[in-house]
Amino acid sequence: MSHNTFGHLFRVTTFGESHGVALGCVVDGCPPGLALEAEEIQAELDRRKPGQSRFTTQRREPDQVKILSGVFGDDRTGGRQLTTGTPIALMIENTDQRSKDYSEIRDSYRPGHADYTYDAKYGFRDYRGGGRSSARETAARVAAGAIARKVIPGITIRAALVQMGPHAIDRANWDWAEVGNNPFFCPDAKAAALYESYLDGIRKDGSSVGAVIEVIAEGVPPGLGAPIYGKLDADLAAAMMSINAVKGVEIGDGFAAAALRGEDNADEMRAGNDGRPRFLGNHAGGILGGISSGEPIVVRFAVKPTSSILTPRQSVNRQGEEIDLVTKGRHDPCVGIRAVPVAEAMMACVLADHHLRHRGQVGDRV
């Protein structure tokens, strides 16, 4: 299986399966001399790890990260661990696999999952928990994202769940401080209360629901990205689409821009106090012509409902026989919840990569 590496200069390669011994990543291209401790990576992983509320999978994984290479410290660094510029290898052991839950479906194709397509491509697959196609793989991305943030210290990246099922937040109530106060990473306290009762009903039905996640990067300087095939927004779209269960991505106003007139969509400019243009709006989501404008970068993506549900579903098996299938195992009733820290990580990886590419092409000019 190829295509396990993301990025050009800041390169992230992930490895591992849902029920394997461990998963992890190798980060190549991280500059030397950056302070990096396992605790900083762990803090990000703790936001994503399962089993923290009744609204996520009850699989209990501590997701303890181990740094295997790429950092070093001694008396000259004051005991701090600094990146050496060599590949940084991270490992997260799996400790709570329950593979027996999947023995009955090893020859069956679960509707909505990648079982059939993996079989069609490779002729062989790890059916335990979805193997490589499981969202468990995203733990490695979150770990890599913690390193990426070190490369772009002046940029703030935050994400939130802004819609669950048909219920969108009231943007007038947006408060970033609320994101850490509820299990949904929701910036609207009233919406979070609604989501609690709504998702309880979904769980009791043995069903699932989708979500919309919004991720915003502030402090991005103008100039990141390149025309045509190196567009920043193209790489961001690819990064978000690579997250499990994501079915659509938009930047700025996205699809809503199709309903606007030209004078409503184009962000007007005036002279700023720093000599640069000051934008009067941000319909473009911080990117023009594939290059960052200096405005906040705004990306949203849609996450489909978790395909593993208790309702019997029609399917077929490897022998071509028609079957009715009930999926067992432990699953998220809304996989979009834990996609929030994953979205931040992918934004960080893309921006770190483009920061290094920009510096390599034009120096430190911003």
UniProtKB/Swiss-Prot annotation:
It comes from Methylorubrum populi (strain ATCC BAA-705 / NCIMB 13946 / BJ001). NADP(+) binds at residues 48, 54. GO terms for biological process: amino acid biosynthetic process; aromatic amino acid family biosynthetic process; chorismate biosynthetic process. This is Chorismate synthase. The lineage of its organism: Bacteria, Pseudomonadati, Pseudomonadota, Alphaproteobacteria, Hyphomicrobiales. Reduced FMN (FMNH(2)). InterPro entries: Chorismate_synth, Chorismate_synth_AroC_sf, Chorismate_synthase_CS. Belongs to the chorismate synthase family. FMN binds at residues 132-134, 244-245, 289, 304-308, 330. PANTHER family: CHORISMATE SYNTHASE (PTHR21085:SF0). GO terms for cellular component: cytosol. It is an enzyme of class 4 (lyase). One of its GO terms (molecular function) is chorismate synthase activity. This reaction introduces a second double bond into the aromatic ring system. Its cofactor is FMNH2. NCBIfam families: aroC, PRK05382.1. Gene3D superfamilies: Chorismate synthase AroC (3.60.150.10). It holds the Pfam family Chorismate_synt. Pathway: Metabolic intermediate biosynthesis; chorismate biosynthesis; chorismate from D-erythrose 4-phosphate and phosphoenolpyruvate: step 7/7.
